[in-house]
Amino acid sequence: MTEPVVKTDAIIIGAGPVGLFAVFELGLVDIKAHVIDILDRAGGQCTELYPEKPIYDIPGLTIVTGQELTDKLMDQIKPFGAEFHFNQRVETLERLDGGFRVTTDADTVIEAKVVVIAAGGGSFTPKRPPLPRIEEYEGKSVFYSVRKMESLRGRDVLIVGGGDSALDWTLNLQPVAKSITLLHRRAEFRAAPASVQKMMALVDSGDISFKLGQVTELHGEDGQLNAVTVKGPDGATFEQPAEIMMPFFGLTMKLGPVADWGLELHENLVPVDTAKFETSEKGIFAIGDINTYPGKLKLILSGFHEAALMAQQAHKYVYPDKKLIFQYTTSSSSLQKKLGVK
């Protein structure tokens, strides 16, 4: 049975922080949005990969976790009644007369005047270590992200890797876990020097262990890990006890169907102009980590700025005969009414 076509003003692809803030900025100029995301919840990488990891560079928030930021954004956009389509990936994007039609892999069909791509780096999957039978342990005692740190309280945790994620989670989980062992193939790290310094201080104090080597084999039953075999730099092997293993070898980013939509691309990113954040296709915008332009910084706050400018241009497509008068939320009674504060 064919699903009925949904009609709206704007389609936002991606429900990460930048996509969520786009709902807010579009709402201020009377543009209603439907949001599509391949994940099962809002937040993007913030909630999927580091929901409890602290973020320090959001203006006005000294410290906030990925989950907290997502919750605040979801609360902020409530007045605009955005509709979400989770667990769906956009498969096709077609141009119509005066707009676009998007079809997802769940056969949802949405038509809108503008499309906003806020899909981060595209779809992402953690890089899986090439270990025999690792899939038997995944989701039970091998994890690529931390949803709730409390679930690791009192556990013997082995963290594998030498980048920022490995070091950050070593530091964040140290007060929670029974023991933390950081394993890396060499003594040099690809992480922030301050994090490396803090980690080495914990090693010196005996609060965590650091070992050199690579995991070659997993040991356990019914998906529950109890130890791993490690091959050291000298070729000798040893067993490392572990109830939980967390490998951080980076992410594999895939642009996915976006690459087939006829947009100009540059190194798997979407070039935009910095006045409107419009792509090479009129009416299609790209904001956040998926876009590129001279001086681009991949920061959440940069994406917020891009969303604000995008909304001003999107208004011209949704309301071509209506001039947009710029207003401030602090002084505009009409904007305050939309936000439900007046």
Language-model segments: what does each one mean?
Residues T8-V35, W169-Q174:
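N-terminal Rossmann-like FAD-binding beta1-loop-alpha1 element of flavoenzymes
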Residues R95-D97, T108-D204, F210:
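Predominantly flavin-linked oxidoreductase catalytic cores and closely associated redox partners
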Residues M1-D9, D71:
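Extreme N-terminal leader/targeting segments of oxidoreductases
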Residues D40-V64, A192-K198:
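Conserved N-terminal glycine-rich FAD pyrophosphate-binding loop of Rossmann-like flavoproteins
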